[in-house]
């Protein structure tokens, strides 16, 4: 499916690029000839402003040609180097918060054409623990961001009670799996975040996330628990809701596997949000094909204090920097 914004950007760049070339190689030489003739006739007494009036550049041509370099730079940077994204939900808390604006490294997993996202040059593959932006497999118009937990060939098991992972690499060949990956967890501690639950006037249930000092409470709120999860040599923080249990019946059940156990097929990945009880991820809809990968999240370049679907109430400049 074509990326409409990228398609419009490519078309605009091509059109303005043609105007730039036409001006540079056809109209500009003719203007210079007329200006030189006028200057010679006036005995070299004409200034630059007068010369421009002698051979003026049409407004439409000047606008199109002047916009081309800007559009070309935007197209190249956005398509092949870095693209900005906004975090719209709390599924990657505490690593990424609602209102964070991030930079995504587009060349991390391959150089792709900007319209259809077909890989032109392979540059790498997701590593375990990478924070990945990808096209949602069930609706490629949507961009999702999650952490790569399972790589091709991994056997991933999630315990919905302890909320812990078990990962065994090398299971896709039909032979015995390799030794389990060291997955360790720190002790559970109260986090800085409280999740609130309420209903709008129409009866629709809503939820919000607020940073609240540990010695304070918030009405209709539950303080989330936090712990460190280490997958091999990658450590990050995760959040859980103390009283929540996963809706295991809604898990994606892979044919031939027990519920809550998945073997990642070749060329696909198992993605999970760091906010484990508030993330719609591979547990519920399955794997992410390599063709859906957009890039790797690398940095926060701006952050607004806001709730999902609401206007910002302030800036969080302290969050600007690298993502881990």
Curated annotation (Swiss-Prot):
**What are its E.C. numbers?**
3.4.21.89
The impact of changing residue 91 to A is: Loss of activity
Signal peptide segment: none
Q: Which reaction does it catalyse?
A: Cleavage of hydrophobic, N-terminal signal or leader sequences from secreted and periplasmic proteins
Recall the GO molecular function terms of this protein's record: endopeptidase activity; peptidase activity; serine-type endopeptidase activity
The PTM Blocked amino end (Met) maps to 1
User: Quick one: a GO biological-process term for this protein?
Assistant: proteolysis
Keyword terms, alphabetized: Cell inner membrane, Cell membrane, Disulfide bond, Hydrolase, Membrane, Protease, Transmembrane, Transmembrane helix
List the transmembrane segments.
4-22, 59-77
Domain of life the protein comes from: Bacteria
What Pfam families does this protein map onto? Peptidase_S26
Q: Where in the cell is it found?
A: Cell inner membrane
Q: Catalytic positions?
A: 91, 146
| Membrane topology label | Multi-pass membrane protein
What InterPro entries does the database record attribute to this sequence?
Answer: LexA/Signal_pep-like_sf, Pept_S26A_signal_pept_1, Pept_S26A_signal_pept_1_CS, Pept_S26A_signal_pept_1_Lys-AS, Pept_S26A_signal_pept_1_Ser-AS, Peptidase_S26, Sign_pep_all-beta_subdom
In terms of PROSITE patterns, this protein maps to:
SPASE_I_1 (PS00501), SPASE_I_2 (PS00760), SPASE_I_3 (PS00761)
Periplasmic domain ranges by topology: 1-3, 78-324
Q: List the disulfide bonds.
A: 171-177
Gene Ontology CC:
plasma membrane
Which residues lie toward the Cytoplasmic compartment?
23-58
Give the family this protein belongs to, as stated in its UniProt record: Belongs to the peptidase S26 family.
What name does UniProt use for this protein?
Answer: Signal peptidase I
């Amino acid at each position: 499916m074509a990326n409409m914004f990228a398609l419009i950007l490519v078309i605009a760049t091509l059109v303005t690029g043609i105007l730039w070339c036409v001006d540079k190689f056809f109209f500009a030489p003719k203007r210079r000839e007329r200006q030189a003739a006028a200057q010679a006739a006036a005995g070299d007494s004409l200034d630059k402003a007068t010369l421009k009036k002698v051979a003026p550049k049409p407004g439409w041509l000047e606008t199109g040609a002047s916009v081309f370099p800007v559009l070309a730079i935007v197209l190249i940077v956005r398509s092949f180097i870095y693209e900005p994204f906004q975090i719209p939900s709390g599924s990657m808390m505490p690593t990424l918060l609602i209102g964070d604006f991030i930079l995504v490294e587009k060349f991390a997993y391959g150089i792709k054409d900007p319209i259809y996202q077909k890989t032109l040059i392979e540059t790498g593959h997701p590593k375990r623990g990478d924070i990945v932006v990808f096209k949602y497999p069930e609706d490629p118009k949507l961009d999702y961001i999650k952490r790569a937990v399972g790589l091709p060939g991994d056997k991933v098991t999630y315990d919905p009670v302890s909320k812990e992972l078990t990962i065994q690499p090398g299971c896709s060949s039909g032979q015995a799996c390799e030794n389990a990956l060291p997955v360790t967890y720190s002790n559970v501690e109260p986090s800085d975040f409280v999740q609130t639950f309420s209903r709008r006037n129409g009866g629709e249930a809503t939820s919000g996330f607020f940073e609240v000092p540990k010695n304070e409470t918030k009405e209709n709120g539950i303080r989330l628990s936090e712990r460190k999860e280490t997958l091999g040599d990658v450590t990050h923080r995760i959040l859980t809701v103390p009283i929540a249990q996963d809706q295991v019946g809604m898990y994606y059940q892979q044919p031939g596997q027990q519920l809550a156990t998945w073997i990642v097929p070749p060329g696909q990945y198992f993605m999970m949000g760091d906010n484990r009880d508030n993330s719609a991820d591979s547990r519920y809809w399955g794997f992410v094909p390599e063709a859906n990968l957009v890039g790797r999240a690398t940095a926060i370049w701006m952050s607004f204090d806001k709730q999902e679907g609401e206007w910002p109430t302030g800036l969080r400049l302290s969050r600007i920097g690298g993502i881990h």
